A protein has these predicted regions:
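ATP-binding/phosphotransfer module of carbohydrate and carboxylate kinases, centering on a glycine-rich
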Residues: 1-74, 88-90, 113-115, 135-137, ...
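Short glycine-aspartate micro-motif
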Residues: 14-18, 75-79, 143-148, 154-156
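Short hydrophobic alpha-helix segments
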Residues: 38-41, 97, 167
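A charged helix-plus-loop insertion that forms the helical arch/lid used to bind
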Residues: 93-100
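Glycine-rich phosphate-binding loop of actin/hexokinase-like ATP-binding domains
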Residues: 140-197
Length: 324
């Protein structure tokens, strides 16, 4: 447990947490986006909320041992990006497809109790939108959509520079949109946008389209590397996924008319292999003139996104409070 009386006056040092059903990332960072240390650990399947809390504490203790050895100040706040149906106002996670045992879990209050620090918490897609707004492709952009791809496909939305929360206090569940009567499901429904274009969905799509091409234990990152190295089967899979993403974004573009759409991790690793089919499908589905279409880009942060998502909620709180 951290003690408030141990803080250095005027310090703004952040203990960041990025959590989904596959991996826990803890980082020590600053409001300027510098990450001094980071540790990651796999998250066991079918794990309880209390067990994940213990894992967070163990990893945080290890991280702070490293930072204290470097004489870095004690963090004065906790920032967390969490997957699932997280209400940012109450800090309660109602449910999450990648944490099936979790129901109405008081994530923020439990983190605050254990760390004895103020905690700012956001759904992962919203945290991604904030990371891009402050440090990535969204700098200087007032209206943007960030596409979070793990574990389901969600939209983090900023309108006129303000982060949008739906009535449940979370990010838009864009992935529920059905694009076909059948197809990959990922952690959503068959034929949904999550099924075609989320990280889990794209892996499933690869095995559906090319069942003999990869070993059963291959992961998505290997298939991404194959596409980057010119494998036509892998490139075809990601072209289909990008096309479906572009189709699925069309209603959002008509509704919000954003300036910019940013593809999150891991789709950003594919660059134009994924983005070009998405752009073409979006243009065809909206039937808008090129001048009226938003720019659609892979995240320039890309591999740094997970660590910056971890600290972005606290940075947003610091900046909005200082502006008031």
């Amino acid at each position: 447990m951290l003690r408030k009386e141990a803080f250095l006056n005027g310090s703004s040092n952040i203990l960041g947490i990025n959590l989904d059903g596959e991996r826990l990332l803890v980082v020590y960072g600053s409001p300027t986006g510098i990450i001094y240390e980071r540790l990651s650990a796999p998250v066991p399947a079918q794990v309880s909320f209390s067990a994940v809390l213990e894992l967070i504490m163990v990893q945080a203790d290890r991280l702070l041992t490293l930072t204290q050895a470097q004489h870095l100040p004690v963090p004065d706040r906790v920032s967390a990006a969490i997957s699932g149906n997280l209400d940012a106002e109450t800090g309660i996670l109602g449910s999450a497809v990648d944490f099936p045992l979790w129901k109405q879990e008081p994530v923020r209050s439990q983190l605050s109790l254990r760390f004895n620090l103020p905690v700012v918490i956001e759904q992962k897609a919203n945290a991604g939108a904030l990371a891009e707004y402050y440090f990535g492709g969204g700098q200087g952009v007032r209206n943007l959509v960030f596409i979070g791809m793990t574990p389901t496909l969600r939209a983090g939305i900023l309108t006129n520079g303000r982060l949008y929360h739906n009535s449940g206090g979370t990010a838009g569940q864009l992935g529920s949109l059905r694009l076909a009567g059948d197809g990959p499901a990922g952690l959503g429904k068959p034929g949904s946008l999550t099924g075609f274009a989320s990280a889990a969905g794209m892996l499933e799509l690869a095995f559906k389209r090319c069942p003999q091409h990869w070993e059963n234990d291959v992961d998505l990152f290997q298939i991404i590397r194959d596409a980057q190295n010119g494998d036509p089967y892998a490139q075809e899979v990601f072209a289909e996924a990008g096309t479906q993403l572009g189709r699925g974004l069309a209603p959002l573009v008509h509704l919000l008319q954003p300036e910019l759409i940013i593809i999150g991790f891991p789709g950003c690793l594919l660059a134009d292999i994924f983005a070009n089919p998405a752009r073409a499908a979006l243009a065809a589905a909206t039937d808008l003139a090129e001048s009226a279409l938003p720019r659609l880009i892979p995240s320039p942060l890309c591999a740094r996104l997970p660590e910056l998502e971890a600290i972005a909620p606290a940075i947003h709180r610091i900046k909005t409070q200082s502006a008031e």
